[in-house]
Structures are given as structure tokens and as C-alpha cells.
Amino acid sequence: MAAVITWALALLAVFASTQARKSLWDYFSQNSWSKGVMGQPQKLAQENLKGSFEQDLYNMNNYLEKLGPLRGPGKEPPLLAQDPEGIRKQLQQELGEVSSRLEPYMAAKHQQVGWNLEGLRQQLKPYTAELMEQVGLSVQELQEQLRVVGEDTKAQLLGGVDEALNLLQDMQSRVLHHTDRVKELFHPYAERLVTGIGHHVQELHRSVAPHAAASPARLSRCVQTLSHKLTRKAKDLHTSIQRNLDQLRDELSAFIRVSTDGAEDGDSLDPQALSEEVRQRLQAFRHDTYLQIAAFTQAIDQETEEIQHQLAPPPPSHSAFAPELGHSDSNKALSRLQSRLDDLWEDIAYGLQDQGHSHLSDPEGHSG
């Protein structure tokens, strides 16, 4: 609860002087605290409340009173100044005190969630390593099965045009058969990867729940979104590998057809050229597929880093605390900030409700 309040308010301190910062301030000042807590969080970004300045000031003062215990014993939160600029400056001062007290707590939460997500990355590594190994084995198998340079090949070519055409026809059949066979070999690997993602992400849900700053409902949504994204990317990777094999088959088949046309016109068939074509096409398949698997691994890193920031935001001093606001994408950055704030209001509302239930179930703690 303390972490999400600090993170939400510290955003105001970070974005407090440019036009983008003014827009962020407007987000707070146009949404009353009481309605933000009790209403549906997903509607906050869409409401355009036109309350009076006095009402907004009253809400901000109430908010600082709620932060009183976080500022330390013996310190009463002062009332806000009676002008907008004074409010900004005073809030920044208050935030400095609150943030300094909660910085270690937020850093610890961020690190704990990060450790759990690193565990997920390590659990998924064997699946991608297995895929890489299978690509290498498949290339070796195709290289062996499509080999055309040998004593028997040379003898067959010396026999004349008919023998050369028979060799090319056999080569065409082998290309079709073995590429289709390799395509089938990749299906179990894709299924294991998808199943592994679902299993390990659910394990992540259980392990990260005690450390996440998010409400249980938002935690569940974040985890489900992560599972959906990684599953879709895994299926896309499998589709890409199948497409690479189709391309390999089509390119080799096209080269063989050209060679067949030449042989029918009386051109001599060079087995060395055919062998070199096979080698180059297989190398291209291996190179492209390795890059796609590496891109999938990088996507896992990016998605898990994003969910770490969603579930346990870094402390304000962290370099990744707030997104960069460039001139070209300021609207996009502000949209991301508004989305984050909507999430934070939901977490704050849950935290207050949870504290209310705790007080009701513990009368002594409430009276003391």
C-alpha cells in the first residue's frame, strides 16, 4: 500500500515543470480523492470532473493527512498553500520526506519480484536451447540426405542425359520428403514450449503474489497478459520455423527445376554446383532460424521487465522509474503514465479496503 502511494505521488514530483508535467498534475487535480478510491478505477481516466478549487484543495489536504504516518512520528502534515504553484512546491517537499522513508521498501519489493521473474527466464531457457539444438541437428540431417557429391553421382552423370535427369528427379523427391519430415520434428518442441510457458507463468503467479504491490485482481490480469503474450510469440516462432523450411524447400526445388531444364537442353550437370546450392540454402535457414529464436528470447526479457515495473515499480531514484518524455512521443508517454496511474488508483483502493478489513477484525489494534 505504501509503495503504490509513494510511486503515484512521486510521479508528480518527476513531471512537475514541463507541459507534460502540467498534464500529469491536471490528472490528479481533476479527479477527487474520495471518488478515486470508491469508484471503478478504469473509469477514472475518462471522467472530467469540474469541481471547485476549494474542493480540490480539500481533497489534497485529506490526502496528505492520510500520508501523515509515513512522514515519521511527531510530524503533522501542513495544510496546502492556497495557489496551484504553491501546491506543487509543497507536494514536492512532502514527497521528498515520504519517498526517502519508503525508498528501501520499494527497492526491496522491486528486487524480490525481479528475482522471481529471473527464475521464469531461467526456466524457459532449456526450451529455447532445445530448439536451437534441433535446428542444428536438422541442418546436419538435411545436409547428409541431400548430399550429391560422391563416386556414385559422378558415375551416374557420366552415363548421359537420362542418368542426369534421373538424378535430379530423385533429388527433387528427397528435398520434398526430408523438409516435410523435419517440419514434423519441430511440432513436439513447439508444443512443449507453449505448455512450459503456461506452467511456469502460473508458478510465477504464486511465487510473486506476496511481493507484488499490485492488487490481486491486477496481479492476475498482468500474469494472464504475460502468459498470453509469450504463448502467442511462441506460436509465432513455430510458424516462422515452418515458413523457413517451406522457403528452403521451394528454393531448392526451383534450383533443381532450372538444372533439369538445362539438362534437357543438353547442358552438362555440375554436381559441385548443386551441392554448393544445398549448402548455402541450409546455412541461410540455420542463420535465419537462430536469429528468430534469439529474438524470442529477447522478447521474454522485455516482457518480464515490463511486468516487473507493473507489479513492483522501482523506487523514484531508479533510472527506470519513469519513461523518457521526448518531444516526438510525449503524447504516447503521457498515455502510458495515465494508464499507470489508473492501475495505481486500483491498487490504492484495494490497499485501503484491506486496511479497513484489518481494523474491523482487530478492535484492539484499532483502538490502540
From Swiss-Prot:
This protein's encoding gene: Apoa5
Record localization: Secreted; Early endosome; Late endosome; Golgi apparatus, trans-Golgi network
GO molecular function: heparin binding; lipase binding; lipoprotein lipase activator activity; low-density lipoprotein particle receptor binding; phosphatidylcholine binding
Additional notes on this entry: Mice expressing the human APOAV transgene show a decrease in plasma TG by one third. Conversely, knockout mice lacking APOAV have a four time increase in plasma TG.
Similarity remark: Belongs to the apolipoprotein A1/A4/E family.
GO BP field: acylglycerol homeostasis; cholesterol homeostasis; lipid transport; lipoprotein metabolic process; positive regulation of fatty acid biosynthetic process; positive regulation of triglyceride catabolic process; positive regulation of very-low-density lipoprotein particle remodeling; tissue regeneration
The record's account of how the chain is modified after translation: Phosphorylated by FAM20C in the extracellular medium.
Subunit structure and binding partners: Interacts with GPIHBP1. Interacts with SORL1; this interaction leads to APOA5 internalization and sorting either to lysosomes and degradation, or to the trans-Golgi network.
Protein name per its UniProtKB record: Apolipoprotein A-V
